[in-house]
């Protein structure tokens, strides 16, 4: 009898059949905001090293004591071992995060080598990340506890293992949190990204890189559905600005150093083992506790809509991107030819309004929500998202298969199990 973890983690982690008959590579061209973005990049790097110097110093002292040594190297090598013909060896950053844990398990399930990296920060309850790490460990995946800005740690990992690929999912997430702690976004999403790229460019051989951008880069764009070629020069939040800056930075490293890089613009990912700061997660918690939930509305009381994308579909897109990533062409920091640079949307293509999402949660929780409708504040949120996924479909056969009704049913089942609710008992009304 399969466990609930087996049932709720991705069940289709195999390679995609890649249709190359209509292959398209999507280049990131300079927009009218290029000067602004480079200015943001330079200011951000300066701010990160000034504002976070004490943080990095103290963090480095802690990390120095938590990695290294013969036993540690053995664990890293063992976890990175490939167990299938034609397999890959992947460093997954943010491995105990929501998407990172699912991707790591899917890679391991099909026989790839996987080593995780995570700093276990307290943006949300670290106990959930540690529970994910326990699950990864039970599948033979070793997760290194360390910070993306620790260059010595990253260099050591690449010294121990010649990774063929990097799946970069570590980032400071969330739109509203940027109003409270903007420096954390610079530290993780810009300085951390540059640090990782510096290590990858110097590696020999260089790995191919797939990394998580975000649908938030479309910002205030009103054209729908969003396509990769649409304008992305109107960020609505600092989070979006750092992700757009990341796209410009990765393009530069591809151009100068020959790194094969694929950026993935995720659209509102949800599912089991998700992030507690996401609306569907907090709605579930508050509904079960009998607390009111806040539902934002746009101008003229228009309901907000999101292209909610189930985690299994995102995982399939991540693996398809890895399998079709191509090869980096540099060696020891020197470019020897052009390398692929691609950007893809990964969404569901079927936007659903937030009130309908709440309707579905009520159905599966068997509890009515106490709804409080308020006007959307100017805190970085956007009124709608809608993905055009034709590029990912043409390049590596990406095809989402889970609708919101089915996906939320799986999430609710996991939530009730993980947090110890007795579904046979009368829930709080």
UniProtKB/Swiss-Prot annotation:
The keyword Membrane applies. It is found in: Golgi apparatus, Golgi stack membrane. It is a multi-pass membrane protein. Optimum pH is 7.6. Active from pH 6 to 8.9. InterPro entries: Epimerase_deHydtase, NAD(P)-bd_dom_sf. NAD(+) binds at residues 89-120. It is an enzyme of class 5 (isomerase). Its EC number is 5.1.3.6. The active site is at residue 239. Its main location: Golgi. Signal peptide: none annotated. Inhibited by UDP-Xylose. Keywords: Carbohydrate metabolism, Golgi apparatus, Isomerase, Membrane, NAD, Transmembrane, Transmembrane helix. It catalyses: UDP-alpha-D-glucuronate = UDP-alpha-D-galacturonate. The keyword NAD applies. One of its GO terms (cellular component) is Golgi trans cisterna. One of its GO terms (biological process) is cellular response to hypoxia. In root stele, leaves, siliques, flowers, pollen and stems. GO terms for molecular function: UDP-glucuronate 4-epimerase activity. The chain crosses the membrane at residues 36-56, 87-107. UDP-D-glucuronate 4-epimerase involved in the synthesis of the negatively charged monosaccharide that forms the backbone of pectic cell wall components. Belongs to the NAD(P)-dependent epimerase/dehydratase family. Homodimer. This is UDP-glucuronate 4-epimerase 1.
